[in-house]
UniProtKB/Swiss-Prot annotation:
Subunit structure: Interacts (via IMD domain) with RAC1; this interaction may be important to potentiate PDGF-induced RAC1 activation.
Species of provenance: Mus musculus (Mouse)
Phosphothreonine found at: 257, 606
CDD domains referenced in this protein's UniProt entry, alphabetically: I-BAR_IMD_MIM (cd07643), WH2_MTSS1 (cd22060)
Domain named IMD: residues: 1-249
Keyword Coiled coil: yes
Protein name: Protein MTSS 2
Pfam families: IMD, WH2
Gene it is expressed from: Mtss2
GO cellular component terms given for this protein: cortical actin cytoskeleton; lamellipodium; plasma membrane; ruffle; ruffle membrane
Principal location listed in the UniProt entry: cytoplasm
List of residues that carry Phosphoserine: 261, 404, 542, 564, 575, 587, 597, 602
């Protein structure tokens, strides 16, 4: 009995120890759960960071694939590595979700259940133990009473005593068994907690193992990358193939830089020069409808630092730009398509140094260029053959006297005075802006945008009385600036809003083919808009890049002999604002000329005459072959007479800039000078009508049928 009691006491103590252990484990479980929650939060942040990292990694891989130097093998390997990392990131996301859904949340719920179950076990065990102990105590007391009676010898009590002792022993055995069952339940409860924890942990570990299994695939990829990038200083065959393929391709690189800083903040010429402009975002085939000129072709864009391949083009461009400077510098340095427009214009430089440099340049080109042996041509690819011209020595030899050395200075002074007029006001025109406006991309006076596709031509004269007068005495390819004093005379006659000008590619053809009225005289300069099949493209405000600005061209026309054998009525070789005339006897190179840049056609010829050797570069080289000795002498005389009149034009130009209009009497003495008639003899010198007389006479527009809302409305 005592032994059984001791065993029951030992079992009860064991049960109580187990229950106490379970109760003391609650803080540990709760701490684990909180730490798991923190891990889950960090893993979520890691997943987001991994997604951003892999997006950037993918861009690097794509760049390696598209870069010529990295080769596609490196890019492909990087792409595969990025894909493996994305798979790892997916498994990491699954592991993070499993950590929260399979471990943290269920474990938190089970901890509460475990607390309840442990308390219930303790209560049940205590209740059973007390009941058993109470029964044993009661039975034991009865047994003691029987023992006392048996000792006194009262009756036969021994069988009852033995039965009572057996009942007490049975009760102790029952209590012992009850304690053992209680201990088993406690052990099962404690074990069940860890089994449940393993059940919760299994999905988390499985997700982690799957994620780590993806990492093993990175070994082969990194081995391939190490082999591909073993020698960074040696080009692989794929990169060598890029160089070989480049030889047969046609590339034209354009290097463009922002223009110089504006002189004042109020100037419309100020541009966003502080912003980096894209190099080739402007389409070279799209006409600039609101600025009045065609965008610069990348073929003619010259880099700031010339490469070896540009040496020949620079030579030809210097030859082309020197033609206008030989006869009074009517075209500034930035008007040539191949000139560097990032340099300051002639109005931004000191006048003394500009004139001296131009004079030295003219003298140098006169000394180095050959005599007039043939006319140059302009090919479709933009390359120019150096054009020949009659040197001053040849003119002096044929004319009989030497040209005055001050003629060149007078010409440059006159041209500079006329070219500086475009600085006075640029509010009404976008021709001198850099291609953007504060409100709209159309001109300020235009009411609508001009689509690239049109169905008609609008033709209006800028030559005054076209019905009674002959060819004008200024160049037919001149472009009148909108904001000069010349344009002010036009505005007096046109009391309407300024139309948005258009520009396109010139096409060669006869006047009838271009829509010119048959009754129009050959000297009427027209501005016509040609229908285009290109889609409507509006110029962007600032993404189109800087636009080279061409200063106004005000050339002087040298009179020619209408009855000379080589003289034929001029024909159209251009269209729109770049109006140009050539002879009907032009060589077959004229169609190729029409395909060239319109700005190339806008350059006036050197002699400003229709029969000079320089015209052969525009209208073909056949004029030189047909010219006779008498014609050359007549041309020399015409040029000399033009130089003599330049002195008088200087005073008139300065007076014109001040608002006065004094004109030499020699230029407008007789009406026959304004309306020249064919002389009876080819050797007679026809009087010259200069540009100032045409300005004084004014301009009269001819009505045409058009439905273009941007065309000028003649009141």
């Amino acid at each position: 009995m005592e032994t059984a009691e001791k065993e029951c006491g030992a079992l009860g103590g064991l049960f109580q120890a187990i229950v106490n252990d379970m109760k003391s484990s609650y803080p540990i479980w709760e701490d684990f759960n909180s730490k798991a929650a923190k891990l889950h939060s960090q893993l979520r942040t890691t997943v987001l960071a991994a997604v951003a990292f892999l997006d950037a990694f993918q861009k690097v891989a794509d760049m390696a694939t598209n870069t010529r130097g990295a080769t596609r093998d490196i890019g492909s390997a990087l792409t595969r590595m990025c894909m493996r990392h994305r798979s790892i990131e997916t498994k990491l996301r699954q592991f993070t979700n499993a950590l929260l859904e399979s471990l943290i949340n269920p474990l938190q719920e089970r901890i509460e259940d475990w607390k309840k179950s442990a308390n219930q076990l303790d209560k049940d065990h205590a209740k059973e133990y007390k009941r058993a102990r109470h029964e044993i105590k009661k039975k034991s007391s009865d047994t003691l009473k029987l023992q006392k009676k048996a000792r006194k010898g009262k009756g036969d009590l021994q069988p009852q005593l033995d039965s009572a002792l057996q009942d007490v022993n049975d009760m102790y055995l029952l209590l012992e068994e009850t304690e053992k069952q209680a201990v088993r339940r406690a052990l099962i409860e404690e074990r069940g907690r860890f089994c449940t924890f393993i059940t919760f942990l299994q999905p988390v570990v499985n997700g982690e193992l799957t994620m780590l299994g993806e990492i093993t695939h990175l070994q082969g990829i990194i081995d391939d990358l190490v082999v591909l990038t073993a020698d960074p200083h040696k080009l692989p065959p794929a990169s060598e193939q890029v160089i070989k393929d480049l030889k047969g391709s046609d590339y034209s690189w354009s290097y463009q830089t922002p223009p110089s800083s504006p002189s004042s903040s109020n100037s419309r010429k100020s541009s966003m020069c502080s912003l980096a402009q894209p190099a080739t975002t402007r389409l070279s085939s799209v006409s600039s409808h609101d600025s009045g000129f065609v965008s610069q072709d990348p073929t003619y864009s010259k880099p700031p630092s010339p490469m070896p391949s540009d040496i020949t083009s620079q030579k030809s461009s210097s030859s082309a730009s020197s033609e206008a400077s030989e006869t009074c510098q009517s075209v500034s340095e930035c008007s040539s398509p191949t000139s560097d427009w990032t340099k300051a214009g002639p109005h931004e430089q000191p006048s003394a140094t500009t004139l001296q440099r131009r004079k030295d340049r003219v003298e140098h080109l006169r000394d180095t260029e050959p005599g007039p042996t043939g006319g140059g041509t302009v090919g479709s690819s933009g390359e120019e053959v150096p054009r020949t011209r009659m040197s001053p020595a040849t003119i002096a030899a044929k004319h009989g006297e030497e040209v005055s050395p001050a003629a060149s200075d007078l010409a440059m002074v006159l041209t500079r005075g006329l070219s500086l007029e475009h600085q006075k006001s640029s509010r009404d025109s976008l021709q001198y802006s850099s291609g953007y406006s504060t409100q709209t991309t159309t001109p300020s006076c235009s009411e609508d945008t001009i689509p690239s596709q049109g169905s008609d031509y609008d033709c209006y004269s800028v030559n005054g009385d076209a019905d009674s007068e002959g060819p004008p005495e200024f160049d037919k390819s001149s472009t009148i600036p909108r904001n000069s004093n010349i344009a002010q005379n036009y505005r007096r006659l046109i009391q309407t809003k300024r139309p948005a000008s258009t520009a396109g590619l010139p096409t060669a053809g006869l006047p009838t083919a271009m829509g010119l009225p048959s009754g129009a005289p050959p000297g009427v300069a027209t501005i016509r808009r040609t229908p285009s099949t290109k889609p409507t493209v509006r110029r962007a405000l600032s993404s189109a890049g800087p636009i080279p600005i061409r200063p106004p061209i005000v050339p002087v026309k040298t009179p020619t002999v209408p009855d000379s054998p080589g003289y034929v009525g001029p024909t159209r070789a251009g269209s729109e604002e770049c109006v140009f005339y050539t002879d009907e006897v032009a060589s077959p190179l004229a169609p190729d000329l029409a395909k060239a840049s319109p700005k190339r056609l806008s350059l006036p010829n050197t002699a400003w005459g229709s029969q000079s050797p320089e015209v052969a570069s525009y209208g073909g080289g056949a004029a030189v072959g047909l010219a006779t000795e008498d014609e050359e002498q007549q041309l020399a005389a015409n040029r000399h007479s033009l130089v003599e009149k330049l002195g008088e034009l200087v005073a008139g130009a300065h007076a014109l800039g001040e608002g006065q209009f004094p004109f030499p009497t020699a230029l407008s003495a007789t009406p026959s000078e304004e309306t020249p008639t064919p002389p009876p003899a080819a050797t007679s010198d026809p009087p010259a009508e200069d540009m100032l007389v045409a300005i004084r006479r004014g301009v009269r527009l001819r009505r045409t049928v058009t439905n273009d809302r941007s065309a000028p409305r003649i009141l």
